[in-house]
Amino acid sequence: MENLISLVNKIQRACTALGDHGENSALPTLWDSLPAIAVVGGQSSGKSSVLESVVGKDFLPRGSGIVTRRPLVLQLHKIEEGSREYAEFLHLPRKRFTDFVAVRKEIQDETDRETGRTKQISTVPIHLSIYSPNVVNLTLVDLPGLTKVAVEGQPDSIVKDIEDMVRSYIEKPNCIILAISPANQDLATSDAIKISREVDPTGDRTIGVLTKIDLMDKGTDAVDILEGRAYRLKFPWIGVVNRSQQDINKNVDMIAARRREREYFNSTPEYKHLANRMGSEHLAKMLSKHLETVIKSKIPGIQSLINKTIAELEAELTRLGKPVAADAGGKLYAIMEICRSFDQIFKDHLDGVRPGGDKIYNVFDNQLPAALKRLQFDKQLSMENIRKLITEADGYQPHLIAPEQGYRRLIESSLITIRGPAEAAVDAVHSLLKDLVHKAISETLDLKQYPGLRVEVGAAAVDSLERMRDESKRATLQLVDMECGYLTVDFFRKLPQDVDKGGNPTHSIFDRYNDSYLRRIGTTILSYVNMVCATLRNSIPKSIVYCQVREAKRSLLDHFFTELGKMETKRLSSLLNEDPAIMERRSALAKRLELYRSAQAEIDAVAWSK
């Protein structure tokens, strides 16, 4: 069971070392979940004397006004009988104090280091561990004494500042409140009882300690309070008799003071029946036992919190990415790895692993055929246009058998309109590839970490796509131009010949320009153009895929990689510039993760019985 208090002691020290003081922050706090005993009392309530009685040593700064200006986490460790007593501070890990006067001075000096030689307060705790055969295993948090007025040298807000600090500790459900109240004052005016009642109205977490019982007016006693009739708490009140100022001035040691305290309760008729549960020795043992019980009950919940928070911290650190390498080689490698991640995500979109690539097929299967169907060949092949072009093609010598030059001009003028849908298909695929680049950039976590690199990679990828688009447009339009430049002769050879059985032409040279003749030419040309459209409907997608999609998968960032190899260290560094807020957040998260992992290891190492 003693291991449990030691466990919490270790975790508390780790919290302070790694900056977790339980303050409100954007980071998860382990400090707030740890069971602790907070010592609360007004100034001159005897709070310091109670702590020194529990420890058995004079070690706390004394004086008028606010003496305790930072939380003091006091961790007591029982060691073997005959061993020498010593103290250690967390901020001086390799120094042992055997002189407790020096301990008092170091508490004062460390307070001044944080707050300056003023009467300001600080929430950053001081950790003091005391090792002695005369103590029980126990952890207490000594908080600044509550006050009602600011004195000279203190800010006007000091009353509220102290109250807020005390409240921040005792309002936590895992905090045990040790409320120190002087018996020679009306309990209704007790600062400790007042504030503890506000945060613990049922009294389930509050342990009442009554000091200065021996200083009460003659004819009065504290029996009603100690027996719980005046103010009931879940745990019995404990009375203590501290050393007087005269005793302190005479350096009366704690052993003698404890003996006199026992004698007082045993010999005073009003308290004799309560003597077995009075005094600082009983208080220390009771607190140690109660703290062990609370820790044991809270450990499973703390373990669950630690495991959950570790997962959350690791996830956020993953989202923020790794810190930047210092050397040029490391920077170049980091950039290359990030670019490869982006490139793979882009390929995954094209290959169907991620959504988006199917839209390219939609261009080929729907948009291109629909655009080809919308071409108005009937306008090109109207009677007037056919007659006009054939007549112009004949010139001053009319054709003898078939108007070949007219055919060619009509076919060329029809096929040339296919360039529009072909070019539109190239542009549509280019637009989709750009969209996939932007998607891949947004899905590459490391690029979110480096805005400069994100812009450069995006620009380089789009530049590559534009070069590929230009090449695709050239190759695709060349397919259309090839169809215009050379006709498929076999198509015309296979057309049925319009001759009678005698082999004489049906149309004479004089009626070759009539509507029937021109209609026949239009029908023939339309059949040929439709055949070419069917061919291009298959070949245009092949050209686009070869020149754009395939090339984008193969060499999207090749030009960027070439330029990257030429960059100087300064330029590489600029690509990996991070938002300072992200850098600070990552550092804070890494420290907090270290704390939680340390706590997890400490808990796992302790064999505690359920």
Curated annotation (Swiss-Prot):
Top-rank lineage group of the source organism: Eukaryota
Residue numbers binding GTP: 41-48, 142-146, 211-214
Record-linked InterPro entries: Dynamin (IPR022812), Dynamin_GTPase (IPR001401), Dynamin_GTPase_CS (IPR019762), Dynamin_N (IPR045063), Dynamin_stalk (IPR000375), G_DYNAMIN_dom (IPR030381), GED (IPR003130), GED_dom (IPR020850)
Region (G5 motif): 241-244
Gene3D superfamilies to which the protein is assigned, alphabetical: Dynamin, middle domain, P-loop containing nucleotide triphosphate hydrolases
Subcellular location: Cytoplasm, Cytoskeleton, Phragmoplast
Major location (coarse): cytoplasm
GO MF annotation: an example: GTP binding
A Pfam cross-reference name: GED
Record region (G1 motif): 41-48
GO CC field: cytoplasm; microtubule; phragmoplast; plasma membrane
Residue numbers spanned by region G2 motif: 67-69
UniProt keyword list: Cell cycle, Cell division, Cytoplasm, Cytoskeleton, GTP-binding, Hydrolase, Microtubule, Motor protein, Nucleotide-binding
Region (G3 motif): 142-145
Region G4 motif, residue ranges: 211-214
Domain GED: 518-610
Domain Dynamin-type G: from-to ranges: 31-300
GO biological process terms on file: cell division; receptor-mediated endocytosis
Protein's job: Microtubule-associated force-producing protein.
Family under the similarity heading: Belongs to the TRAFAC class dynamin-like GTPase superfamily. Dynamin/Fzo/YdjA family.
Protein name per the record: Dynamin-related protein 5A
